């Protein structure tokens, strides 16, 4: 549970608290020393960890002595952020802030971590400990009001508990704002500012314009509390969720919108190496295998503008090779681009290039008769095609992906009556010619890593959709070829 998390306004969302313990002290010229004492332990290994994205990474480890003391100490300074000490058994941890002062002492009582723990040597963490106590107290009251609200049997009780909840929530937010005002230079103030959400102008929009204005205001002010030159916030539990929410919920899923926002954030972070690295790594991981069709254009953009220019020098050779190979597999098949021509021949050896196919819509199907999934899906694709789309002028360009299976390919075509398809394959001579010219293969051009792989092209062979099931192809065609409803028979009724 995370006490840094913003308190939700809605009564429908459960309030949760994370117990954070702080320890910090007077900084020394070099290195750090973190001491923890607890009579609840007399041996084992404890770990000093820090938050980074969704991970809790181990910074150091040390043995707990018979008196329950453990010391973490090195000559190098810790990078600022939110750290934790994980006790033996890994079932308890103490969270604390690390900034300039890095001599830290914590005397912990696990029977009441918030109220019985003593922190010395760190003004930053003393402030943090007081904040914990306040949040813990208000959190229990908020939970009580929430449960009472759920158990309310009439509107009067519901209204009362909802108001109490709102008042308590305001007290908590006011307390946070006061820390920011009274201790503006503190790390806690910086973190609390980073967490703040934009206040919506019209909390209850009435018109569509109200909703649009709310969205635009929220998006415009989403990053107001974030200083992208402050690397400390990447080592916290709340920064990654804020980034994820922005790109997954706030920004339009259209690739151009994501690209524009990605470039903007990277521009703001370019003078902060760790922040820049964090953002570029996350964006690359998010869009190398995107959830939505077409968003692979974001990954290709990141590769072309950043990775291919040597900017991501922190990546090792294996990582860079994987990113490069994936980018090259996607460059030629982005949604909206013209698909690469396929110079294939039919079963009689007659040349039938893709660009020679005249049709308003062309389904390109890469398949293999020995593929179990193909044996199931290809007949279903054909049934859908005959039932709905053949009469609309749609054509299927079926590409055999394994030349050695030509006899089984012909048998399959005859068995399932696929003669209405344009059935083709690439000759060994053509494959050799392409290889010798060091040109990309059709499997690279179309990112064919499994079969069946389906593409939908328009009359000019631009890619409308790709990597879909036959059902999804059917849905897309339904939208594209949807005929106007004939209302003649309903006239006058």
Model-derived segments and spans:
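A non-transmembrane, solvent-exposed segment enriched in polar/low-complexity residues
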Residues: 30-184, 191-195, 199-225, 229
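A cross-family structural signal marking well-folded subdomains
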Residues: 256-315
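Structural microenvironment flanking redox-active thiols in thiol-disulfide oxidoreductases
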Residues: 376-416, 432-439
């Amino acid at each position: 549970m995370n006490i840094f998390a913003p308190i939700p306004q809605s009564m429908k969302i459960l309030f949760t608290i994370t117990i954070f313990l702080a320890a910090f002290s007077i900084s020394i010229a070099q290195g750090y020393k973190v001491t923890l004492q607890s009579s609840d332990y007399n041996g084992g290994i404890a770990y000093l960890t820090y938050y980074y994205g969704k991970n809790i990474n181990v910074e150091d480890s040390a043995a707990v002595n018979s008196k329950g003391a453990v010391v973490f100490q090195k000559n190098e300074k810790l990078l600022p952020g939110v750290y934790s000490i994980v006790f033996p058994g890994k079932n308890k941890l103490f969270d604390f802030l690390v900034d300039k002062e890095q001599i830290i002492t914590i005397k912990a009582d696990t029977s009441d971590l918030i109220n019985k723990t003593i922190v010395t040597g760190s003004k930053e963490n003393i402030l943090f400990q007081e904040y914990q106590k306040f949040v813990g107290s208000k959190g229990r009251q908020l939970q009580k009001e929430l449960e009472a609200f759920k158990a309310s049997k009439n509107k009067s009780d519901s209204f009362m508990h909802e108001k109490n909840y709102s008042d308590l929530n305001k007290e908590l937010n006011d307390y946070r704002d006061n820390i920011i005002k009274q201790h503006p230079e503190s790390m806690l103030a910086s973190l609390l500012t980073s967490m703040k959400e934009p206040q919506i102008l019209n909390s209850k929009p009435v018109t569509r314009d109200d909703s649009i204005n709310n969205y635009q205001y929220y998006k415009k002010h989403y990053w107001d509390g974030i200083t992208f030159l402050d690397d400390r916030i990447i080592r916290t539990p709340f920064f990654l969720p804020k980034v994820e929410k922005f790109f997954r919920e706030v920004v339009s899923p259209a690739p151009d919108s994501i690209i524009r926002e990605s470039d903007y954030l990277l521009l703001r972070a370019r003078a902060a190496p760790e922040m820049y690295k964090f953002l570029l790594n996350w964006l690359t991981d998010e869009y190398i295998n995107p959830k939505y069709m077409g968003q692979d254009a974001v990954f290709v953009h990141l590769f072309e503008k950043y990775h291919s220019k040597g900017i991501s020098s922190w990546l090792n050779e294996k990582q860079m090779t994987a990113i490069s190979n994936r980018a090259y597999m996607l460059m030629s098949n982005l949604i909206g681009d013209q698909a690469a021509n396929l110079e294939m021949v039919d079963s009689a050896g007659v040349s039938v290039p893709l660009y020679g196919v005249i049709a308003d819509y062309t389904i390109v199907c890469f398949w293999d008769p020995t593929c179990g999934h193909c044996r199931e899906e290809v007949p279903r694709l054909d049934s859908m095609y005959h039932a709905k789309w053949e009469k609309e002028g749609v054509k299927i360009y079926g590409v055999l992906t394994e030349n050695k299976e030509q006899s089984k390919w012909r048998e399959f075509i005859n068995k399932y009556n696929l003669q209405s398809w344009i059935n083709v394959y690439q000759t060994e001579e053509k494959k050799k010619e392409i290889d010798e010219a060091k040109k990309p293969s059709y499997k690279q051009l179309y990112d064919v890593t499994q079969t069946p792989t389906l593409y939908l092209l328009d009359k000019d062979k631009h890619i409308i959709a790709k990597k879909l099931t036959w059902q999804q192809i059917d849905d897309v065609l339904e939208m594209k070829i949807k005929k106007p409803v004939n209302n003649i028979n309903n006239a006058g009724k």
